[in-house]
A protein has these predicted regions:
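Phosphate/ribose-recognition catalytic cores of enzymes acting on nucleotide-derived substrates
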Residues: 211-326
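Di-metal (Zn2+ and/or Mg2+/Mn2+) metal-binding site signature of metallo-dependent hydrolases
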Residues: 28-47
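Positively charged, low-complexity intrinsically disordered leader regions
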Residues: 1-29
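Surface-exposed amphipathic alpha-helices with a cationic face
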Residues: 43-51, 153, 157
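ATP-dependent adenylation/pyrophosphate-handling site
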Residues: 22, 26-29, 47-74, 79-80
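Residue-level signal for inorganic ion chemistry
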Residues: 36, 96, 133, 194, ...
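Glycine-rich, Lys/Arg-enriched anion-binding loops that position phosphate/diphosphate groups
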Residues: 157-258
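N-terminal Rossmann-like or analogous alpha/beta NTP/dinucleotide-binding catalytic cores
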Residues: 65-159
Length: 326
């Protein structure tokens, strides 16, 4: 594999900085989209194995999820269609660091997709002196996904290796914990289930952009965020939210969707408009995070702006009751 396709980053620094490949390591392997509760259990197991083996713990993953390389072709009207990503790469790295992971080995999926499964363990050994692996029960690798978790564990079962760890299926709320189940919950308007499986609320973080200032004229000024390309957009509708601003944490009411009452364009771009309850400052150009806590109602088109104003007032009142202080 060409070195141009590879980067090692220390997670002990903020922001993460490039480092040389470690001489010895235990590696956690997976896509880790969303870094949900099962992922975090895997990462903690990797950190324990690495500490017992006297070496650093790293994560081997891709710049972009492998699913990105097998996309369905969108229809023309899907220019702003929802993606599948549950978090950004920077959010993913921060969550790795929270669990005590020392470094991440990022590579391009295209650089390894055709490597035979039998050659993959040697790639890990030569790449960073990998002496132990930790993965989930359903981990696949190698060309065509021919390699299994059991095969990888067998390849790292030499006496000189740190014992391999394969984590079994984790179940929660009557089902398997998985990124695909979290996506399904968000698309169906169930942020509570998504949060239970993730261990945190689904969120959107970004720089507030200027809108049409209609919310201000209605008496409910909003902070507007766009979903990055590839990011999963939850079910369109109104949410009770918790909003993290540079000036503190506030309850909020967020509309995710296309603003049908005021936007008559053929293919409007979905966004997130949040009325921050109890906040009176200016957030334009500042970074905020919106946690989606409770789905209140579907997005709808109102007959006039007075009806829209009344609905926002009701939504804000309900959100203020639901969003408790941290």
């Amino acid at each position: 594999m060409e070195r141009s396709h590879v980067v090692f980053l220390s997670l002990q620094d903020r922001p993460p900085r490039p480092i040389a490949a470690p001489e010895r390591a235990v590696l956690c392997l997976g896509n880790f989209d969303g870094v949900h509760v099962a992922h975090r259990a895997l990462l903690r197991a990797g950190v324990r194995s690495a500490r017992a083996g006297g070496c650093p713990c790293g994560v081997f993953c891709f710049y972009r999820p492998s699913s990105d390389y097998f996309p369905a072709l969108p229809a023309p009207e899907a220019a702003y269609a929802s993606g599948t990503h549950l978090c950004s790469l920077s959010e993913k790295l921060a969550r790795f660091a929270e669990e005590g992971v020392d470094f991440v080995w990022l590579c391009s999926f295209s650089a390894v997709r055709d490597i035979p499964a039998g050659d993959f363990p040697e790639l890990l050994r030569t790449g960073c002196g990998c002496q132990g692996v930790v993965c989930g029960f359903n981990y696949r690798y190698g060309a065509g996904g021919a390699g299994t978790a059991a095969m990888l564990a067998a390849a790292f079962s030499c006496p000189s290796d740190v014992p391999p760890v394969v984590l079994p299926e984790m179940r929660l709320a009557d089902g398997t914990v998985s990124s695909s189940r979290i996506r399904a919950a968000l698309r169906s308007g169930d942020p509570r289930l998504a949060a239970a499986l993730s261990g945190r609320a689904y969120s959107l973080e970004g720089c507030v952009v200027a809108g049409r200032h209609l919310g201000h004229r209605l008496g409910f000024p909003t902070a507007n965020l766009y979903f990055p390309a590839g990011r999963l957009i939850p079910a369109h509708g109104v949410y009770a939210a918790r909003v993290y601003t540079p000036d503190g944490v506030f309850p909020g009411v967020s509309n995710v969707g296309v603003r049908p009452t005021v936007d008559g364009s053929a293919h409007p771009r979905p966004n997130c408009e949040t009325y921050v309850i109890g906040f009176s400052g200016n957030l334009y150009g500042r970074s905020i995070r919106v946690d989606f806590l409770e789905y209140l109602r579907p997005e709808q088109k109102f007959s006039d702006l007075d009806a829209l104003r009344a609905a926002i007032a009701r939504d804000a009142e309900r959100a203020a009751e639901l969003v408790l202080p941290e």
